[in-house]
C-alpha cells in the first residue's frame, strides 16, 4: 500500500519488503515438490520452533517426575490461527516416545468449541490410559470457547491480551470447574487422579537469544542483505524471499517477488501434514522443519530402571486410600 501510494503521489520512495514472522504465515501454499511458494519459510520461525522443541524436552522431564499429582500439562503457544508453531513440538520427539498431543487451529472445528473440548478430553484420556500422563501443546487460535479476545485497529485478534487463554480454558474443562458438587469441589474429567495444569511461555518464545537457531539467524541476515541489494539497484515494489532447494542436503537461495503477489498470498498449515487422528503432524512436516532449527537439540540422560526384590509392606498414600 505504501508503494502504491508513493507512486500515485510521485514520491521518490523505494519500497522493499523483508519477510519476518514467527507465525510463518507470510508466503504461499505447499507445492508438489515439498517446498512452499512465494517464501518457503519466514525468518524467526526456525528460532521459535527450536525454542518450543527444547521447552517440550524440559517439560517432559518435569512431567515424568510430577505426573502422580499433575498428570496433564497443557502448554499454550503463539501462532494465532496458524499451526506452524504448535506443530514444532513434534521436533522434540520425532520418534513419538513422549505422551504428546499437538492441537493445531487447522485440526479442529472453527465453530464447534464444545465438540473440540470433548474431542481433546477423549484424546487426553487415551494417553492417560496408556502412559498415565500427557503433555498437550495447543495453538492460541484453537476454538475452545469465548476467550474475551481484544482486537487491534485492523480487526486482528490479540490473543495475548484476551480475558482468558486457550490453555486456561482447556484445563478448566479437563479439571471440571464447570461442574462442581454441592461442596464446591470440581468434578474432574480426567480418568486418573490429579489435575491438569497449564503453562504459557509468552513472549519468551520469540525473544530468547539463548535458543536462537543459527540457521535462522544466518538466513535472516542474508535475506536482509538481498533486500538491500534490490533497493540499491533501483528496483521497487519487491520483497526479498527465501527459495528452498527441494533436494537434500538442505540449501536455500534468495530471490525477489512482487509485493502485490505477497499481499495476495495466503498460507495455512497444510492439511496433508496433519495426522489422521488430528492430534499430531506427519513425518513430512518433520523433514521440512528439522533443518530450520539448526544444531541438534539437547539430550537428556535416561537411567536404566533396575529393580530389587520387594521387602517392605506396600504403602498406599493417604490420598489414594
Positions of PLM-derived features:
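Residue-level preference for alpha-helix termini and adjacent loops
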Residues: 21, 25, 77, 101-102, ...
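Acidic, glycine-rich active-site loops and adjacent beta-strand->loop/helix elements
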Residues: 19-24, 80-81, 107-109, 202-205, ...
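Accessory alpha-helical/coil subdomains and C-terminal extensions
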Residues: 1-16, 27, 33-194
Amino acid at each position: 500500500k505504501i508503494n502504491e501510494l508513493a507512486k500515485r503521489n510521485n514520491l521518490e520512495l523505494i519500497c522493499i519488503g523483508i519477510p519476518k514472522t514467527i507465525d510463518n504465515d507470510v508466503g504461499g501454499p505447499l507445492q508438489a515438490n515439498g517446498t512452499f511458494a512465494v517464501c518457503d519459510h519466514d525468518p524467526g520461525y526456525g528460532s521459535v520452533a527450536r525454542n518450543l522443541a527444547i521447552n517440550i524436552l524440559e517439560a517432559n522431564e518435569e512431567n515424568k517426575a510430577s505426573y502422580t499429582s499433575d498428570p496433564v500439562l497443557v502448554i499454550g503457544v503463539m501462532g494465532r490461527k496458524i499451526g506452524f508453531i504448535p506443530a514444532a513440538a513434534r521436533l522434540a520427539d520425532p520418534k513419538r516416545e513422549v505422551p504428546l498431543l499437538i492441537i493445531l487451529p487447522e485440526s479442529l472445528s472453527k465453530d464447534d468449541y464444545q465438540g473440540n473440548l470433548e474431542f481433546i478430553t477423549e484424546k487426553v484420556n487415551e494417553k492417560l490410559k496408556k502412559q498415565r500422563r500427557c503433555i498437550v501443546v495447543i495453538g492460541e487460535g484453537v476454538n475452545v470457547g469465548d476467550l474475551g479476545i481484544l482486537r487491534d485497529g485492523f480487526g486482528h485478534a490479540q490473543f495475548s491480551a484476551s480475558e482468558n487463554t486457550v490453555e486456561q480454558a482447556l484445563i478448566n474443562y479437563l479439571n471440571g470447574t464447570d461442574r462442581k458438587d454441592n461442596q464446591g469441589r470440581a468434578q474432574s474429567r480426567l480418568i486418573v487422579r490429579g489435575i491438569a495444569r497449564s503453562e504459557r511461555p509468552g513472549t519468551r518464545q520469540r525473544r530468547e537469544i539463548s535458543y536462537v537457531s543459527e540457521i535462522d539467524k544466518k538466513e535472516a541476515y542474508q535475506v536482509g542483505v538481498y533486500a538491500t541489494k534490490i533497493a540499491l539497484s533501483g528496483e521497487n515494489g519487491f520483497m526479498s524471499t527465501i527459495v528452498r532447494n527441494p533436494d537434500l542436503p538442505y540449501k536455500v537461495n534468495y530471490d525477489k517477488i512482487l509485493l502485490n503477489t505477497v499481499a495476495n498470498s495466503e498460507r495455512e498449515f497444510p492439511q496433508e501434514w496433519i495426522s489422521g487422528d488430528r492430534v499430531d503432524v506427519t513425518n513430512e512436516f518433520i523433514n521440512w522443519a528439522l533443518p530450520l532449527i539448526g544444531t541438534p537439540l539437547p539430550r537428556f540422560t535416561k537411567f536404566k530402571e533396575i529393580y530389587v526384590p520387594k521387602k517392605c509392606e506396600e504403602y498406599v498414600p493417604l490420598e489414594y486410600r
